[in-house]
């Protein structure tokens, strides 16, 4: 794949992921390939934003749809929205 396959997406963080990342999100997270496995995408995000400590406890969402199977390959387009959602507890 060439560099022209990369896409820019909106990235949102919630709860603990926001706290660890130090930002609520960004409008220009660069994904290196338009087609990518959810697990690879989550690894990219966790490595870039120091979220490795919660990597195994978060849910990745793509355009408000949970990526239930991290081995699934998804297609990302410019302007898509990704969200990192940690477990939420409360009463």
Curated annotation (Swiss-Prot):
Modified residues (Glycyl adenylate): 91
Pathway: Cofactor biosynthesis; molybdopterin biosynthesis
SUPFAM superfamilies in alphabetical order: MoaD/ThiS
Keywords for this protein: Cytoplasm, Molybdenum cofactor biosynthesis, Nucleotide-binding, Phosphoprotein
Note: This protein is produced by a bicistronic gene which also produces the large subunit (MOCS2B).
Pfam families registered for this protein in UniProt: ThiS (PF02597)
Keyword Secreted applies: no
Gene Ontology annotations of biological process type: Mo-molybdopterin cofactor biosynthetic process
Chief location category: cytoplasm
Protein name: Molybdopterin synthase sulfur carrier subunit
Function in brief: Acts as a sulfur carrier required for molybdopterin biosynthesis. Component of the molybdopterin synthase complex that catalyzes the conversion of precursor Z into molybdopterin by mediating the incorporation of 2 sulfur atoms into precursor Z to generate a dithiolene group. In the complex, serves as sulfur donor by being thiocarboxylated (-COSH) at its C-terminus by MOCS3. After interaction with MOCS2B, the sulfur is then transferred to precursor Z to form molybdopterin.
Family affiliation: Belongs to the MoaD family. MOCS2A subfamily.
Binding partners and assembly: Heterotetramer; composed of 2 small (MOCS2A) and 2 large (MOCS2B) subunits.
Subcellular location(s) of the protein: Cytoplasm
Gene that this sequence comes from: Mocs2
Entry comment on modification after translation: C-terminal thiocarboxylation occurs in 2 steps, it is first acyl-adenylated (-COAMP) via the hesA/moeB/thiF part of MOCS3, then thiocarboxylated (-COSH) via the rhodanese domain of MOCS3.
GO-annotated molecular function: molybdopterin synthase activity; nucleotide binding
Species in which this protein is naturally found: Anopheles gambiae (African malaria mosquito)
Highest taxon listed in the record's lineage: Eukaryota
